[in-house]
């Protein structure tokens, strides 16, 4: 194809054709005309023309073709210019109305904002009125809850000790005795980690069994007989055997007495079913059936 386009002009019946092959093949594409974009000139209206147009616009916003032609003859302008002017004038009028409505809403909105706190205050007052009865009813509830709290005050401990004397009064009497003896013992042997060294386990397991057979048994005989007999031993009678970290275990369903020291701890848990004694080096277990 390119060779056909590049070849020199050829003759047809002895007449030389000087036109190119592209023109012969596509005569309409040979010299395309560049279309010029029509530029609409801006129309400037005089004061007299504007007065005539405004007068007609005051009468009607949508004039018909006859009215537009009549006005166009008066102001010496084409009818199309008059039509465009009315179109723009209607758009301008709508824009002004929207601005006025928005401005009116902006002026009314602050009034609504001013009235809204009053509504909120009224709603809050109504809400507070609704919530005041629960608050008044909750005061007796708080007073009733303060009553159990007052049980732990020193003034009310003494009257409550009588109904609890059957089971817990013996425990209360055993607190100071066991703690004072243990504190004195720990002062003498704070550095060592062994407690109750050199004691015979069978010497206190049998009386403990008789003392702990009943659920309401007291701790004062045990603490006065068994614990004091072994705590009052001389330091020379403490061999290398240690019963420190594991301590004495007496499981009880009622209460638990815990005494913790920096070096070691011993725990008394009272149970009438099982008596366990554990050592650090060897695990011993004594169960009284």
From Swiss-Prot:
Record's keyword annotation contains Lipid metabolism: no
Gene assigned in the entry: otx2
Localization terms from the record: Nucleus
Keywords per UniProt: Developmental protein, DNA-binding, Homeobox, Nucleus
Keyword Nucleus: yes
DNA-binding region per Swiss-Prot/TrEMBL record: 38-97
Region (Disordered): 93-142
Protein name stated in the entry: Homeobox protein OTX2
One cellular-component annotation, GO: nucleus
First-listed, main subcellular location of the protein, grouped into a coarse class: nucleus
Biased composition, class Low complexity, residue ranges: 95-106, 118-129
Classification via PROSITE patterns: HOMEOBOX_1, HOMEOBOX_2
Organism of derivation: Danio rerio
């Amino acid at each position: 194809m390119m060779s056909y386009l590049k070849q020199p002009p050829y003759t047809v019946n002895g007449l030389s054709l000087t036109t190119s092959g592209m023109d012969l093949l596509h005569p309409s594409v040979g010299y395309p005309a560049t279309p010029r974009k029509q530029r609409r000139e801006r129309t400037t209206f005089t004061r007299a023309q504007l007065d005539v147009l405004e007068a007609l616009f005051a009468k009607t916003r949508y004039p018909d073709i006859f009215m537009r032609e009549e006005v166009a003859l008066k102001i010496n302008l084409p009818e199309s210019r008059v039509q465009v002017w009315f179109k723009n004038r209607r758009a301008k009028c709508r824009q002004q109305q929207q601005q006025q409505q928005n401005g009116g809403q902006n002026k009314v909105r602050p009034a609504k904002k001013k009235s809204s706190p009053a509504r909120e205050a009224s709603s809050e007052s109504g809400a507070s009125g609704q919530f005041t009865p629960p608050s008044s009813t909750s005061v007796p509830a708080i007073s009733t809850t303060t009553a159990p709290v007052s049980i732990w005050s020193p003034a009310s401990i003494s009257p409550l000790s009588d109904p609890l004397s059957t089971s817990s009064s013996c425990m209360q009497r055993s607190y100071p005795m066991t703690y004072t003896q243990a504190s004195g013992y720990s002062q003498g042997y704070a550095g060592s980690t062994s407690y109750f060294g050199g004691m015979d386990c069978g010497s206190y397991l049998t009386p403990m069994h008789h003392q702990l057979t009943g659920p309401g048994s007291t701790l004062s005989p045990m603490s006065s007989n068994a614990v004091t007999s072994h705590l009052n031993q001389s330091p020379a009678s403490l061999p290398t055997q240690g019963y420190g970290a594991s301590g004495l275990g007496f499981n009880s369903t009622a209460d638990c007495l815990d005494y913790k020291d920096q070096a070691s701890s011993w725990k008394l848990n009272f149970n009438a079913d099982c008596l366990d004694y554990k050592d650090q080096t060897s695990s011993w277990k004594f169960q009284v059936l």
